[in-house]
């Protein structure tokens, strides 16, 4: 998105009551974070920069310490380690948190997922090492590809120096209220039981929980669920080809979708998605490692001469006015412009539905050519 859209989003988020703006980049390219941090500072919000945690020989303790210093220097109010795949094991959590606390004065938050089964233990060691905040989920929505359960962590820290002071009885009431929603989601098929258990392949293939869900969904649509393990094995190979980025939105979708194509087509990169091409062209930012030159040649060909090394948004013209002009017929509040900027088709469908509810006219059945609007 152009800088003016990012700035407007931050402005309206804070105006509508959001206290903390968590800002991250799928490549940990600091250049892509500065606009949002500056906008948050301007609006007197809390700018939290999240570094996407991953494994690989480039992601050393020195790397994380250097990144933490750069995050503090850019004006962030706190630092979050975003372990979207549940790759951070307990012993490494101790090392990482201690290193971060030594390299920055910012509060450090840890966000992980239970996908690999180690998250609760990781939180215990991280808290003992000095982490300031941990992210949890109420028990009906916890575990699997989600976070450790809030109630469990509260009980684990009870009567210790890390006692949260939260009332377990009140937390249980909240859990009881939401538990039927979980059962409904399971019964309807909205929630796939495959994402509820422990998947040790997360540690083998470094695949985040949300990415696992997407892969299952993509293969199910193609009737190729039997290719699941094969696709999982292809993911780290594609990731390495694309400069070894952390697997988080949108890089996780890019790598995952390309892995699916590589397996289903029977030939690697026989079909390359637009997003794969864009990441190789530098349109998402700078990766920590170089791309596989053979893949670059196969996917881009002569187009590789158009690759960029600057901050991608530097090449984008301001677009807020243009976006507002496109959707002005639907605008009822400032936030509508942002909805359209982020999700143009979904937002347009919603605007039409909202209009139909307000006027009693269903735009889908209207004969706009002859001016007939049935009610």
Task: Name each model feature, range by range.
Residues 84-270:
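Catalytic alpha/beta core domains of metabolic enzymes, predominantly
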Residues 46, 111-113, 353, 373:
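Histidine (H) residue identity feature
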Residues 32-41, 66-75, 90-104, 124-134, ...:
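Short secondary-structure transition/capping segments
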Residues 1-110, 123-131:
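Alpha/beta enzyme core
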Residues 9, 24, 141, 157, ...:
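Phenylalanine-focused residue identity feature
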Residues 2, 60, 149, 167, ...:
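Helix N-terminus capping/helix-initiation residues
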Residues 192-202, 206-375:
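Terminal or standalone catalytic/regulatory effector modules within metabolic enzymes
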Residues 3-4, 19, 25, 29, ...:
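Acidic-enriched, low-complexity/disordered segments with a strong bias for Aspartate over Glutamate
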């Amino acid at each position: 998105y152009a800088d003016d859209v990012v700035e407007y989003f931050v402005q309206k988020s804070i105006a509508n009551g959001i206290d903390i703006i968590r800002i991250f980049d799928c490549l940990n390219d600091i250049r892509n974070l500065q606009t949002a941090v500056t906008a948050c500072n301007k609006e007197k919000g809390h700018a939290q920069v999240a570094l996407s945690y991953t494994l690989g020989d480039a992601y050393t303790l020195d790397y994380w310490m250097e990144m933490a210093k750069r995050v503090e220097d850019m004006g962030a109010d706190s630092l979050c380690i975003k372990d979207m795949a549940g790759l951070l094991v307990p012993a490494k959590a101790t090392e990482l948190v201690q290193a971060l606390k030594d390299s920055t004065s910012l509060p450090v938050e840890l966000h992980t997922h239970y996908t690999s089964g180690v998250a609760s233990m990781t939180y215990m060691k991280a808290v003992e090492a000095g982490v300031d905040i941990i992210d949890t989920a109420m028990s009906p929505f916890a575990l699997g590809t989600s976070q450790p359960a809030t109630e469990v962590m509260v009980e684990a820290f009870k009567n210790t120096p890390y006692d949260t002071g939260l009332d377990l009885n009140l937390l249980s009431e909240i859990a009881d209220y939401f538990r039927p929603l979980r059962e409904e989601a399971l019964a309807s098929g909205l929630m796939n039981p495959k994402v509820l258990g422990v998947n040790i392949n997360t540690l083998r293939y470094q695949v985040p929980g949300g990415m696992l869900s997407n892969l299952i969904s993509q293969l199910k649509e193609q009737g190729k669920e039997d290719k699941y393990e094969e696709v999982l094995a292809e993911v780290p190979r594609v990731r390495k080809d694309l400069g070894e980025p952390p697997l988080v939105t949108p890089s996780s979708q890019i790598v995952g979708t390309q892995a699916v194509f590589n397996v289903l087509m029977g030939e690697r990169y026989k079909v390359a998605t637009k997003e794969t091409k864009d990441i190789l062209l530098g349109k998402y930012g700078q990766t920590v490692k170089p791309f596989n030159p053979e893949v670059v040649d196969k996917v881009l060909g002569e187009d590789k001469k158009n690759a960029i090394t600057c901050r991608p948004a530097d090449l984008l013209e301001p677009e807020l006015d243009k976006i507002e002009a496109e959707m002005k017929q639907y605008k009822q509040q400032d936030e509508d412009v942002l909805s359209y900027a982020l999700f143009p088709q979904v937002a347009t469908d919603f605007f039409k539905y909202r209009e139909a509810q307000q006027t009693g006219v269903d735009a889908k059945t209207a004969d706009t050519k002859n001016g007939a609007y049935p009610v």
